[in-house]
Regions:
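Flexible, glycine-/charge-rich segments associated with ATP-binding catalytic modules
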Residues: 35-37, 42, 149-231
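Conserved DxG motif in ATP/Mg2+-binding regions
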Residues: 138-143, 213
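Short coil turns linking two alpha-helices in DNA-binding domains
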Residues: 236-239
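Active-site helix-to-loop segments that bind/position phosphate- or nucleotide-bearing substrates
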Residues: 1-127, 133-138, 146-159, 173, ...
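Short amphipathic alpha-helical elements of helix-turn-helix/winged-helix folds
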Residues: 84, 231-232
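Residues in the recognition helix of alpha-helical DNA-binding motifs
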Residues: 242-243
Length: 243
């Protein structure tokens, strides 16, 4: 097992030749109380809100890395949070032979978005990683800014990952696309769903990247001319139903 962890970058030999956990290995497989010794500001937070909640109101359910009742590492956090998010995603009935296909491009895009945040977060930064889920959107905010231009990230093909060893580890569990393809893939899936375009916002000092994933169709913009048309349609409907 140590040899395997060494090969994937979770362990490395020290000056005495002994295998020790790397920073990436600690984040992926360690316990929270061990992780915070290396990353004092390390904190993972998942919050669920119901439809009636405003963004300032209290969550209805929560998972945090510091609770002490689970490991608190990013691997376990990934699976706990993904399973919570995925349970609300509708799966169309499709068969592969006699087997039902329960994994859709939307599921894959959600895994990509979650893994991207965990992989590219700056865990030395003083603000933790926060994921918030409402029935109509998911917001993922991680410490650290893009290491490339945002427009380049949206186009794809260019990548400057902060934690390359974490990419390798997530790839071993079939999570994460090839370098530089994550955001374009997510946007493509959202477009095919007919949903509003995902929004990316960068903030600085402290650096923070926030990805908002709408889970609903784009709203039609009504211009001044459109309002007149809508009014005429309403009059026509009332006239139709009164006759």
């Amino acid at each position: 097992m140590e040899d395997f962890l060494h090969r994937i970058g979770a362990m490395a030999r020290d000056a005495d030749g002994k295998l020790r956990p790397t920073a990436a290995g600690l984040l992926m497989f360690g316990h929270e109380y061990e992780i915070v010794r290396e990353f004092p500001h390390y904190f993972l937070d998942y919050q669920e809100h119901d439809r009636s909640s405003t963004e300032d109101e209290r969550w209805t359910d929560r998972i945090v890395s510091s609770s002490g009742d689970w490991s608190g590492n990013i691997c376990d956090f990934y699976f706990r949070v993904y399973n919570r998010i995925a349970q609300d995603i509708k799966v169309p009935f499709k068969l592969n032979g006699a087997d039902r296909i329960d994994d859709t491009p939307l599921h894959k895009a959600l895994r990509e978005a979650l893994a991207n945040a965990l992989i590219h977060a700056d865990y030395y930064d003083r603000r933790g990683l926060v994921i918030q889920k409402w029935p109509d959107k998911i917001r993922i905010a991680n410490p650290g800014a893009f290491r490339i231009n945002v427009q380049e990230a949206l186009v794809g093909g260019v990548s400057d990952p902060r934690n390359e060893s974490l990419i390798k580890m997530f790839n071993l569990i079939n999570v994460g696309e090839r370098a530089g393809s994550g955001l374009p893939s997510i946007r493509s899936v959202w477009q095919k769903q007919g949903w509003q375009v995902p929004e990316i916002v960068e903030a600085f000092n402290p650096d923070r990247t926030t990805l908002t994933l709408p889970l609903s169709a784009a709203k039609m913009a009504v211009k001044s001319g459109g309002k007149k048309v809508a009014a005429l349609l309403n009059i026509a409907k009332r006239t139709f139903y009164s006759t």
